Amino acid sequence: TLVDDAFCEEMQRVGNLSLSISLEGFEEVNDLRRGVGVYDKVMAAMDKLKSHGLIFGTSICYTSKNIETVTSDEFLDMIIEKGCRFTWYFHYMPVGNDAAVDLLPTKEQREYMYHRVREIRGATGGKQIYAMDFQNDGEFVGGCIAGGRNYCHINANGDVEPCVFIHYSSANIKEVSLLEALKQPLFMAYRDHQPFNNNHLRPCPMLENPEILQEMVEQTGAKSTDLQSPETVEHLCGKCADYACQWKEAADKLWEEHPYVHKGYSNYKKK
């Protein structure tokens, strides 16, 4: 919503930026989550980015309520027409004390996403956009990449967190170097445990393996860094336990039918 002509011109000048624009569906659904009027602002921003020849895509959080919409031909054709080159799909994470667990997709819905995203980006019969699923594409990067394996997150307060969805840390970038932050106990525990599951359709230490995140946070003494609503790791992981059990059955069946291990992407700690 901050994109204007001046911003686009600056993007052209630096030449090394692309934007992922948050979008949850069409106007009614999107504005219910993002705020009234945001959908129209996003559409206007896309028009400006396209007119300046810039590369951009969408960042879509899929939930039990919007999965069919955000993967529909109508929706995809719309964002392609607007100029999107890629679309990131992010599985809803029940982070925060007031997170609605009923927004977690069912195992049937998540299995649908597994097949639908591969269909969208298929060389035959697909769409003219590259679709990626942060959760269901774990097989292509060897599972969880967080905790400094290939990625970490720094929040607005400077707390160095293992992932944008995992708000626990014991290091702040204002107080230590990046190297020191990457060596904090929680990150080292991540490296000790990765991959968190040999089935890379169950990659996350929170969503699909909640007992592991709880153990790591408790053993390392990491503190909640949630800026809005600090949450105990027991409360967070408790919301994922039933989901993890339900998804395991479907995920194991999918993995048995379609195993995939990227041999060049196994940069785990030697054990």
What spans do the regions from the language model cover?
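Generic structural signal for helix capping and beta-alpha/helix-loop junctions
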Residues: E28, N66, G96-N97, S170
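Flexible mid-to-C-terminal extensions adjoining Fe-S/redox cofactors in radical SAM and related proteins
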Residues: F165-K271
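Structural alpha-beta junctions
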Residues: L54, C84, R121-Q128, L227-E231
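A C-terminal junction/extension of Radical SAM enzymes
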Residues: Y92-P162, P203-I212
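Short, conserved loop/turn and helix-capping segments at secondary-structure boundaries
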Residues: V36-Y39, L104-K107, E111, A171-V176
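Generic alpha-helical structural signal
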Residues: M43, D73, E111-R118, L179
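Conserved, mostly hydrophobic/aromatic
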Residues: I21, G158, L178
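Radical SAM/AdoMet-radical enzyme domain recognition
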Residues: T1-F90
